[in-house]
Amino acid sequence: MTQVAKKILVTCALPYANGSIHLGHMLEHIQADVWVRYQRMRGHEVNFICADDAHGTPIMLKAQQLGITPEQMIGEMRHEHQTDFAGFNISYDNYHSTHSDENRELSELIYTRLKENGFIKNRTISQLYDPEKGMFLPDRFVKGTCPKCKSADQYGDNCEVCGATYSPTELIEPKSVVSGATPVMRDSEHFFFDLPSFSEMLQAWTRSGALQEQVANKMQEWFESGLQQWDISRDAPYFGFEIPNAPGKYFYVWLDAPIGYMGSFKNLCDKRGDTTSFEEYWKKDSDAELYHFIGKDIVYFHSLFWPAMLEGSNFRKPTNLFVHGYVTVNGAKMSKSRGTFIKASTWLNHFDADSLRYYYTAKLSSRIDDIDLNLEDFVQRVNADIVNKVVNLASRNAGFINKRFDGVLAAELADPQLYKTFTDAAAAIGEAWESREFGKAIREIMALADVANRYVDEQAPWVVAKQEGRDADLQAICSMGINLFRVLMTYLKPVLPTLSERVEAFLNCELSWEGIQQPLLGHKINAFKALYNRIDMKQVEALVDASKEEVKAAAAPVTGPLADSPIQETITFDDFAKVDLRVALIENAGFVEGSDKLLRLTLDLGGEKRNVFSGIRSAYPDPRALIGRQTVMVANLAPRKMRFGVSEGMVMAAGPGGKDIFLLSPDDGAKPGQQVK
């Protein structure tokens, strides 16, 4: 019976735009992609979207460290992330960024609606402030002991051990991650989302039965401990969206990050010229289904704040959250020193994407359990399942069909009942894919693969091929094997997209869920080519070694201008305003007798002359080349008496020194004496 086509919007949590994608990230994106591909095979309309989470202090500070703008950094990181996901065949319809016009407009819209509906509160709070860096410290830039479970080295917004959320001021023995200093308290006005007003709605949503049991149980604990108002603002300096009518105040990254789901979908609709789907999918009474695949570390934000924000701004809530656990490697947390902290791009340099997709899928269930990537078991399972059980089934039969029957399959099935057993399994396997019991689906498929190989073993086509007068039997046996292989690969298509493409080319037909009800009879297949290569532990060793080398390279001293000359301590605007910078014309320039470093410059400030000694001789061996050039000088620097005379200011130059000194010059049109602002 044909299913009624559903409209489904699927998202993965947004990767943060300050680091590379690693195998921990890939678990979620593979899980979601397998589910999405299955839904598409069943004829549903699926929009699969994601974006980079591109705001926050960490991005601002890292960009400063790299000597580039935050916009440049997040642009480069987004390209890298998209490349990695494409390499793993994650079939996104759109991959966007939270730093976008769509996201700004939607963030402001949701905030405005929440404010108009009375869900935004203002109050002055005491915040942790780094006295050495001169900045308020965001949650993730304070670490200390969790006030709930007493676990050490936890961030200032939530505990990675017990999952609790709290204010940074509640941390025990807090330290600034930026400088290591002990923060002090400073007052600042902040904006709060009134989460407790949605307690009744959230509890009803929890009791609806849609959420995973572990998620619902955890939410109940949070309800019992009482919901708190949520601070949604951050003080400048901050890379993000400024709050409307609140200069110097910015949306906290966790407010605009989930709105990024909406922003990415809006961007997709706009690119398609679709003016109706955004409203259709996000309106309060939408019939479309909305699913978020997320890790267990961000359940609090997605199960409480996000649905409450949507409810308070008159948008629909998620249909469900699909939560997964963490990834360990060889039974332990991913380790850079052991080479098991593996980037997605590094993996693809040593293995194909289908291998990891298969291994993760074989271990996943609908529960929030951690997944262990045991690299030795990985090699054994991929070889045993994909190579020996599935691909080998095709190679054992295709040769006879190609050589003896010109690639044409038999006109009838040798064992219709066996074929029916395979196609009847579609319901159970489909239900396993649907309910995200992926490991169960793989077990059932591999059990069928064992049956198929046992059939070939018993029929022994290599023996039949040598017996005269049994050509029809040989064709029937091998055609049966090929048809069983086709069914198996149809069931595996959501997991193994690259292998599936090769199989479709070999079988000369599309692998479709409904199509297996009609076996391939009298059908011509193409010549068999190797579909999948066996893997070995040498590849694993090379992968681990490469990961270790990447860590060494990353840990090497940073080079470049910022490494050689780090940015100085933050100053106030009032401090900066004391420095009077002026355009100056170099009227004369010459050597200083008795000094091999200095040049004597005579500067015209538009009516006033200054005499300045500058240590730029090594870069300008012919001082006459400077005459007539304009530069910038500090005009209000106290005169300095030197043995060569009095220096009445300082000219501005860049560079590390020696021959690499570069005198700064204003743009064309600037006039001597004009102030640099």
Curated annotation (Swiss-Prot):
Pfam families: Anticodon_3, tRNA-synt_1g, tRNA_bind. Zn(2+) binds at C146, C149, C159, C162. It comes from the Bacteria. Residues 575-677 form the tRNA-binding domain. Its cofactor is Zn(2+). Binds 1 zinc ion per subunit. The keyword Nucleus does not apply. The gene is metG. ATP binds at K336. Keywords: Aminoacyl-tRNA synthetase, ATP-binding, Cytoplasm, Ligase, Metal-binding, Nucleotide-binding, Protein biosynthesis, RNA-binding, tRNA-binding, Zinc. This is Methionine--tRNA ligase. Its main location: cytoplasm. It comes from Salmonella arizonae (strain ATCC BAA-731 / CDC346-86 / RSK2980). Homodimer. GO terms for biological process: methionyl-tRNA aminoacylation.
